[in-house]
Amino acid sequence: GSEVTEKAGFTADATITSGLGLHDVTVAEHALALILAAARRLDTAVRAVDEQRWAKELSVNQPLNNATSFTIVRGSRIVIWGFGGIGQRLAGYLKALGVEVIGVARSAGERGGFPVITADDLPAALETADVLVNILPASPETAGVVNAELLAHLPAKAWLVNVGRGATVDAQALTAALRAGTLAGAALGATAVG
């Protein structure tokens, strides 16, 4: 991301270019894969195969809607925080699967046919979300913004999918929410590095 370039100490006359849009497709597809894996509990299924057992917990009494558990993508409500190129591409994929998508960006309105809210309205949107997808870049303003206060707005059945920078997620708050059962799961494409 640009944060690495900014910290590199280049002189003011150095030319810096952008790869804007270069990874939109691959990151959006990765986010989609994580969402589908969360809904279908592929982690549990793979573990069962490794243990050479039938994953009874995945085949008996699964809800046919998302009222108590996020198990079906169609009809779910997914909030995408970071609604630039990657977020809008992901929104298109999700719309094709029958998902209600809400984008979160610096300014509210509509982008690509999707409703977009600001971070000020994010807590209210999370109250009924099945998934929060974080695609935020790392910056002083975004450091640790996915914190305990924000996670508390998600229902206990919800998942966090992070394909944004790891530094945007408060790892201790996420771990605490998962251990307390106030968040159903997390699919992390990125984590903070030491």
Question: Which positions does each model-derived feature cover?
Answer:
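An N-terminal-biased, well-structured beta-alpha scaffold segment characteristic
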Residues: 1-17, 147
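Gly/Ala-rich phosphate-binding loop of Rossmann-like dinucleotide-binding domains
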Residues: 91, 95, 178-179
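Phosphate-binding beta-alpha-beta segment of Rossmann-like dinucleotide-binding domains, i.e.
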Residues: 14, 19-77
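Conserved N-terminal Rossmann-fold NAD(P)-binding element of oxidoreductases
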Residues: 78-82
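Residues at the starts of beta-strands that form the adenosine-phosphate
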Residues: 77, 91, 99-100
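Rossmann-like adenosine-cofactor binding region
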Residues: 107-194
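Hydrophobic/small residue at the entry helix of a nucleotide-binding pocket
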Residues: 86
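Short, polar loop motifs at secondary-structure junctions
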Residues: 1-5, 103-110
